[in-house]
A protein has these predicted regions:
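Alpha-carbonic anhydrase
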Residues: 2-302
Length: 302
């Protein structure tokens, strides 16, 4: 029997963890596990500064002039109330991915995950007529704690919005869904954040690593964790409407689900996001202005 002291055991555990973290930085998981899948984000040229902000997008991305654009203001009293025959059903969000990265794509912080084809989380039921597989998660924030969400509820903003992107099952990539131009090709579930005095310990898995991606174009691996740690699943009491991406190419192929019950975040945690830089300096605001609802209906699934 091997005798080992507590201090030696702790050193051993720390060494194993360090080796694991180093491996996540250098390994190409798609080569190590050919069946692993990661959602690659198409690259489009845009920004939020005067020279490349939303008022300039229409010059390069004609879809941004469409009549079903996002984000919108949700007038809660005008929402059509629906009693669904079945709840939203979430599968796999309580499991950890093979690997996880955060990226400064020069406009947002993007959380990407890699899964085996059999373990990728998906959502179905409720307002959905298709199955949607997880893709990417995108954070939006603002100059202050009074703004930062792209969507508004009765013209009230939250300090941050997390958009969880999904692809309709059958498409091989986000780019395939964009190219197909099916009006239900993408599902984005938005979660909103509310300032609290205490840090949200679950968000710390991301926040404590933001200093590593301050420079534009940087990407780092972080220890993987279940997505359920940063946003809760839900079955009912959500808003939904048909719209577009809130960033180029602004394709009108998105089913939006908005969860109005906010997630806790502290002022100091939000402040770490404002240190992220683009080529124009710190990203202090990365939200598109709300768009006209026009003839669309917004539904509330009770």
């Amino acid at each position: 029997m091997i005798n080992i002291s507590v201090s030696e055991f702790m050193i051993l555990c720390s060494s194993v963890l360090l080796i694991f973290l180093l491996l996540t930085e250098v390994l190409d998981w798609t080569q190590l596990f050919p069946w692993a899948e990661e959602c690659n984000f198409p690259r489009y040229t845009f920004g939020y500064a005067d020279r490349n902000g939303p008022h300039m997008w229409k010059m390069l991305y004609p879809d941004s002039n469409g009549s079903n654009q996002s984000p919108i203001n949700v007038a809660t009293r005008l929402a059509v109330v629906v009693q669904p025959s079945e709840p939203l059903r979430w599968t796999g969000y309580d499991k950890g991915p093979l690997s996880m990265t955060i990226t400064n794509n020069e406009n947002n912080v993007v959380l990407n995950t890699m899964w085996s084809s059999s373990t990728r989380p998906y959502i179905q039921g409720g307002c959905l007529t298709n199955v949607y597989d997880i893709c990417s998660m995108v954070f939006h924030w603002g100059h202050s704690n009074d703004e930062g969400s792209e969507h508004t509820f009765d013209y009230v903003r939250f300090p941050m919005e997390l958009q969880v992107w999904h692809i309709k099952r059958g498409f091989n990539s986000l780019l395939d869904a964009i190219t197909a131009k099916e009006n239900d090709g993408i599902l984005i579930v938005s979660f909103f954040f509310q300032i609290t005095n205490a840090d949200n310990p679950y968000l710390d898995h991301i926040v404590t690593n933001l200093w590593r991606i301050i420079q534009p174009g940087t990407k780092v691996h972080i220890p993987p964790f279940p997505l359920l740690w940063i946003f809760p699943t839900f079955e009912r009491d959500y808003y939904t409407y048909n719209g577009s991406f809130t960033q180029p190419p602004c394709s009108e192929i998105v089913t939006w689900i908005l969860q109005p019950e906010p997630i806790a975040i502290s002022s100091s945690q939000v402040a770490q996001f404002r240190k992220i830089c683009s080529q124009d300096g710190p990203i202090l605001f990365n939200c598109r202005p709300v768009q006209q609802v026009n003839e669309r209906s917004v539904y509330f699934y009770a």
